Amino acid sequence: MGRRPARCYRYIKNKPYPKSRFCRGVPDAKIRIFDLGNKRANVDTFPACVHMMSNEREHLSSEALEAARICANKYMVKNCGKDGFHLRVRKHPFHVTRINKMLSCAGADRLQTGMRGAYGKPQGLVARVDIGDILFSMRIKEGNVKHAIEAFRRAKFKFPGRQIIVSSRKWGFTKWDREDYERMRAEGRLRSDGVGVQLQREHGPLTKWIENPI
């Protein structure tokens, strides 16, 4: 018997059901890689950022996340090179779906009890997403924004429901707008920390702060 289609588990109707000591025997998620491309690139290498956001409250299967990841990665490697972008999958499949297997052979009514004791066994993993949740993020150079948008447009076809693609006003994966980031970097208030940056806060005695307030 093949895998039950993910359309059977599309809508969020119940509570989160993660893997635990009470929920055992859960199959591994199909998606195992959540960071792709030039993930060691410094924060100043890729100033632009593009997001794929969900516009629907639903479940996304781990198979769909993996298919979309492969699709976006393949297009970006072909058009920008394997070191020309950094793609990050922002949603993880933690919710376990169950299946109550039914026999369809002759004499099945003698072997099974129908809907008596119908609590199923773990079947797969899905990610619970809401409206406005970010599914994928990609940081790139300014000249490659159009390629990132096209990669996400192709990846959208792997998902049910509606998604929107937005170009972020932030600098890369940081939390600051580009103008604020460039100003603080020029002032020497930002210290590079891999993919992100750390804000150098004002430390020292109170008398110094009173003389030169922030």
From Swiss-Prot:
GO molecular function, a single term: structural constituent of ribosome
A Pfam match is: Ribosomal_L16
TM stretches of this protein: none
The answer, when asked if Ribonucleoprotein is one of the entry's keywords, is: yes
Q: What GO cellular-component annotations does this UniProt entry give?
A: cytosolic large ribosomal subunit
UniProt cross-references to InterPro entries, sorted A to Z: Ribosomal_uL16, Ribosomal_uL16_CS_euk_arc, Ribosomal_uL16_dom, Ribosomal_uL16_euk_arch, Ribosomal_uL16_sf
The keyword Ribonucleoprotein is annotated on this UniProt entry: yes
Task: Give the GO biological process terms.
Answer: translation
Task: Name the UniProt key words of this record, in alphabetical order.
Answer: Ribonucleoprotein, Ribosomal protein
Give the domain of life: Eukaryota
Gene3D superfamilies, per this entry?
Answer: Ribosomal protein L10e/L16
Q: How does it assemble?
A: Component of the large ribosomal subunit. Mature ribosomes consist of a small (40S) and a large (60S) subunit. The 40S subunit contains about 33 different proteins and 1 molecule of RNA (18S). The 60S subunit contains about 49 different proteins and 3 molecules of RNA (28S, 5.8S and 5S).
Q: Which family does it belong to?
A: Belongs to the universal ribosomal protein uL16 family.
- What is the designated name of this protein? Large ribosomal subunit protein uL16
Q: Which organism is it from?
A: Caenorhabditis elegans
This protein's encoding gene: rpl-10L
